[in-house]
Amino acid sequence: MSNFAIXLAAGKGTRMKSDLPKVLHKVAGIPMLEYVXRSVGAIXPXKTVTVVGHKAELVEEVLTGQTEFVTQSEQLGTGHAVMMTEPILEGLSGHTLVIAGDTPLITGESLKNLIDFHINHKNVATILTAETDNPFGYGRIVRNDNAEXLRIVEQKDATDFEKQIKEINTGTYVFDNERLFEALKNINTNNAQGEYYITDVIGIFRETGEKVGAYTLKDFDESLGVNDRVALATAESVMRRRINHKHMVNGVSFVNPEATYIDIDVEIAPEVQIEANVTLKGQTKIGAETVLTNGTYVVDSTIGAGAVITNSMIEESSVADGVTVGPYAHIRPNSSLGAQVHIGNFVEVKGSSIGENTKAGHLTYIGNCEVGSNVNFGAGTITVNYDGKNKYKTVIGDNVFVGSNSTIIAPVXLGDNSLVGAGSTITKDVPADAIAIGRGRQINKDEYATRLPHHPKNQ
């Protein structure tokens, strides 16, 4: 029989106090709903249907191509949301997973175990439960003397005795698909919220003598539903611990994992060393034996093997093997650094390609440049790429030496093996093998300093 999945993602999430739909708030780099979609993939569903509502177009954009969508125009409860999938799923034979889109910590392994438990026990419905010492706010699992699940009671509808129960409903279920849609026709809104509860389906199955089971999570953290910013921060913390643990098991060294922030899709090779306060975001890839020191921040970039990045920022760029960057350098988007390049302190590179073994040791701006190999930038070199309206390109050949405090005004090209004298302003192309000097001649005026008021003779 086939597996199906329904993801509930229609709610606004009022307690988040945000214009963004709740399920689109990010945890470790991706929306919560994306985590749910990835975990659901573990059960290999033949059909996945996502129920959208508030700002549906934003939610659909995140899961385009991964699911079918139905709209819940009025948020009338979880049962009502599942009813919206009827045109797609009703009448199909199989097992249907129902899961909330705000549960980013649930793992694919747990969902696979839930489905297997449901099938092996021949249940018509299976509730995914968890145990906690602080069950406030959760629906409680009410069992009979034989430990069979009888019903789920929501917090607002629970008696004082039921509120003491520590086994809680995680909001995730598996149902016999055909029986699910039959039972949904018999639920009503006679409850404190005036909504259609998916949990009422469990009571219907019990009344008809059908088998209802409960599978308990091994890790309570997986049950976390994010309803406010406090829970979002908790989910972020748990996910980052998982991520860092995975990398450590794979051979990455962390000086202080609790102070290191790595997004879920970052790839890190073995033997990388990561100091505290390092942030790696997006689709970043780090090569083997690279060192990332305190304060380094890398976004959507590829860093090769054996690089050393010292307290610097790299954005949407590629850094080859053996490169050294920093401290206090900034590699801005669309830049590429060739092997063994050195970018030193207070150097900014933007939209530029830099060839192998080139060095810019300090206080340099390289913008919109194509730089060859074995180039040396003296301290204080500026490539002037903007005239107030347009950006222009500078092309610098191989083995070029640029003296300190030089200004290179684009568009201009410096030929191979050329040299720019210190303090020059370059406005014209420099031929290969030439020396360019663009500064005023030095003039010494003898004894002139004696006329100045600060001279010792005038004190």
Curated annotation (Swiss-Prot):
Swiss-Prot/TrEMBL catalytic activity: alpha-D-glucosamine 1-phosphate + acetyl-CoA = N-acetyl-alpha-D-glucosamine 1-phosphate + CoA + H(+); N-acetyl-alpha-D-glucosamine 1-phosphate + UTP + H(+) = UDP-N-acetyl-alpha-D-glucosamine + diphosphate
Region annotation (Linker) maps to: 230-250
- What Enzyme Commission number(s) does the record list for this chain? 2.7.7.23, 2.3.1.157
What segment(s) does the record annotate as region N-acetyltransferase? 251-459
Give the note describing cofactor binding and stoichiometry. Binds 1 Mg(2+) ion per subunit.
Tree of life domain: Bacteria
One GO BP annotation of this record? cell wall organization
For this protein, the record's CDD domains field holds:
GT2_GlmU_N_bac, LbH_GlmU_C
What is the protein's given name? Bifunctional protein GlmU
What are the leading ranks of the lineage?
Bacteria, Bacillati, Bacillota, Bacilli, Lactobacillales
